[in-house]
Amino acid sequence: ENNKKMALISKNTEKIAVERHYEDSAQIISYLDKNDKTILDIGSGAGLPGIILDIIKKDHNLEFSTHLVDKSPKKVKFLKSVNSFLDLDLKIHNCDVKMMIKKDFTTLVSRAFKPMKEFFEIIIDSKITFEKIILMKGEKFMDEYNDAKKYFEINCEYYDSITNPSSKLFVIKGVSKI
């Protein structure tokens, strides 16, 4: 019902939501550790991957606070209702990520938000500090990565997605403008 009103996930993937969205989001947990204290899910939309990570963190002996940021009031209203319904302790920010100026997070995560180049520009211009970024990228990941490398020095590794062999998870330890 909410998806019809707010376009939280693609209509093409509603029937396979568990595999396509939840399992896809959950795989990030393998790249988190006890040093990850504050996670910011940028462009959270339907709460993916942030809500899923928050739900499963205890099963992986992890403790972190989860922040979700989205500029859409409708999506934020949905996120707040999920937070309340599931009795989670999410910090939900209704603003453009550019407004998170000079905030400190240990880990930034994002799924289906912006191309890498634009993502890095936003993070650097906003002076958001981080130790690690985990980006979930689809089939055009190499085009995005190669484009971003023209403008940024990127210290990263990338891994195959467990839900789609054409997708990758980028674990980024540092990024700076060239």
Predicted segments with their positions:
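Conserved S-adenosyl-L-methionine
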Residues: 41-45
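Conserved SAM-binding loop of SAM-dependent methyltransferases across substrates and taxa
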Residues: 46-62
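A short acidic, Gly/Pro-enriched loop at the edge of an enzyme's catalytic core
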Residues: 100-107
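Active-site capping/gating segments
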Residues: 140-178
